[in-house]
C-alpha cells in the first residue's frame, strides 16, 4: 500500500484487458496496477508485472453482495419487462439468469472495490477497459480507456467435451454453435436407430438429465409402466455406449429439433424485431429500470445494458427458436408431467413456463 501513495496512475485490469498494453506501463515507477480477477492475476504474474489484487479493497460483506445480486436477477418480474419483452407468454428476461448471475456478481464486486480505491485515491489518473471502465465512470469524471484483447464471453459460449484416448481423458473446448451442429447430426442418426414410438401416449418429460448419473431412474421407469421422453438442448441424452444402452433399455424417447416444421422463425420476424426495439428502448431510457439497477442511489444500468444486449438482444433469434421448439414439442408429444433438476437454465425455464400455461404438473428432482 505504501507504493500506492507514491503513484500518480492507477490501472484496472481484468481478463479482457490487453496485457500488451499493460506492459507499456509496467516499467513506470509512478504506476500502480490492480488485478480484478484470477485470470488477469495469472497473466500479470507470468509477465512479472507487479500488481495488487482487488480483493484487498473489498470491504463489503460477500453475503450482502449475493443478496443484491439475487435482487437484481428479479428484474424479469418488473411489470414493464413482463409486458414488453415476453413471447408466447414466456418471459424472455427470465431465461438467461444462469448466465447473467455470474456477470452481475462480478459487477457488484468490482463496483464495491473501485468505490473504495477511488475514494482513497481521488486525484490520480485512472486507466481501465470494458466493464471496469464503465464502472469507473460512475465515480471518475475523466478516465483513460485501455483496449480489450478479446470480446466478452458467457458460460455456454463454449462447450467442454471429454474424449477418452486409452486411459487418458482429454478435454477440448468447442464453440456452442459447432457443438449444436454435431449434436443435431448425431441425434438424427440415433433417432433413426431408436425409432421414437408412442409419443402420442402419455409421457413424463425429463429435462436436461445426465443419463448415466440417473441410470437407475431411467431403467426403473419401465417397472411403473411409465413412458419417459428426454428433452435436452444443452446436454445430449446419448454420448457414449453406456448412455445409449440406458436410453435403449429404458425405452426412453429422445426428442430432438427434428420436430420443428420448416423455417418457422420467418413467421415471427416482425415479433422478434419489435421485442428487440422494446429492449433497447427500455435499456436506454426507462427510469424504472434505472432505479431498479441502483446501488446506494447510483444507477449501474450503463454497465448492465451492454451485457443484456449481448446476452439477450443479440441472441434473440436463438432464444425465440428455443421457445418455438418447446411449444411444438408440447403440441406434438403427449406430456402429462415434467421432471427438472434445476429451474435456472434456459431450457428448464422455457419448459416450466409452457408447462404452467398448460397446467402440466412439474416435479423438481433434487
Regions found by a protein language model. Name each.
Residues 1-366:
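Catalytic-core helical/loop segments in enzymes performing group transfer/polymerization on anionic/lipid-linked
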Amino acid at each position: 500500500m505504501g507504493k500506492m501513495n507514491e503513484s500518480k496512475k492507477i490501472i484496472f485490469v481484468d481478463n479482457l484487458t490487453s496485457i500488451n498494453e499493460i506492459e507499456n506501463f509496467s516499467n513506470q515507477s509512478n504506476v500502480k496496477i490492480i488485478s480484478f480477477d484470477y485470470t488477469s492475476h495469472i497473466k500479470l504474474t507470468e509477465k512479472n508485472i507487479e500488481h495488487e489484487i482487488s480483493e484487498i479493497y473489498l470491504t463489503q460483506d460477500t453475503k450482502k453482495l449475493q443478496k443484491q445480486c439475487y435482487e437484481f436477477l428479479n428484474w424479469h418480474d418488473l411489470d414493464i419487462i413482463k409486458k414488453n419483452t415476453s413471447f408466447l407468454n414466456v418471459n424472455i428476461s427470465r431465461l438467461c439468469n444462469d448466465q447473467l448471475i455470474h456477470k452481475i456478481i462480478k459487477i457488484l464486486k468490482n463496483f464495491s472495490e473501485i468505490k473504495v480505491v477511488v475514494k482513497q485515491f481521488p486525484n490520480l489518473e485512472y486507466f481501465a477497459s470494458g466493464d471496469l471502465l464503465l464502472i469507473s465512470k460512475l465515480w471518475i469524471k475523466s478516465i483513460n480507456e485501455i483496449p480489450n484483447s478479446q470480446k466478452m464471453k458467457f458460460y455456454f459460449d463454449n462447450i467442454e467435451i471429454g474424449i477418452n484416448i486409452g486411459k487418458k481423458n482429454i478435454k477440448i473446448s468447442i464453440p456452442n454453435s459447432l457443438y449444436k451442429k454435431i449434436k443435431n447430426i448425431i441425434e438424427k442418426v440415433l433417432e433413426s436407430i431408436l425409432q421414437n414410438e408412442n409419443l402420442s401416449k402419455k409421457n413424463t418429460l425429463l429435462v436436461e438429465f445426465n443419463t448415466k448419473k440417473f441410470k437407475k431412474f431411467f431403467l426403473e421407469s419401465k417397472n411403473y409402466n411409465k413412458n419417459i421422453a428426454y428433452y435436452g438442448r444443452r446436454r445430449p441424452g446419448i454420448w457414449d455406449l453406456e448412455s445409449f444402452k440406458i436410453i435403449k433399455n429404458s425405452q426412453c424417447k429422445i426428442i430432438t429439433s427434428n420436430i420443428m416444421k420448416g423455417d418457422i422463425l420467418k413467421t415471427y420476424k416482425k415479433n422478434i424485431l419489435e421485442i428487440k426495439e422494446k429492449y433497447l428502448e427500455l435499456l436506454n431510457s426507462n427510469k424504472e429500470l434505472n432505479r431498479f439497477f441502483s446501488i446506494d442511489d447510483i444507477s449501474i444500468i450503463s454497465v448492465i445494458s451492454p451485457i443484456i444486449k449481448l446476452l439477450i438482444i443479440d441472441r434473440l433469434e436463438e432464444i425465440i427458436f428455443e421457445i418455438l421448439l418447446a411449444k411444438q414439442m408440447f403440441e406434438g408429444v403427449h406430456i402429462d408431467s415434467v421432471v427438472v433438476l434445476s429451474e435456472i437454465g434456459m431450457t428448464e425455464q422455457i419448459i416450466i413456463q409452457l408447462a404452467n400455461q398448460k397446467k402440466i404438473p412439474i416435479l423438481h428432482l433434487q
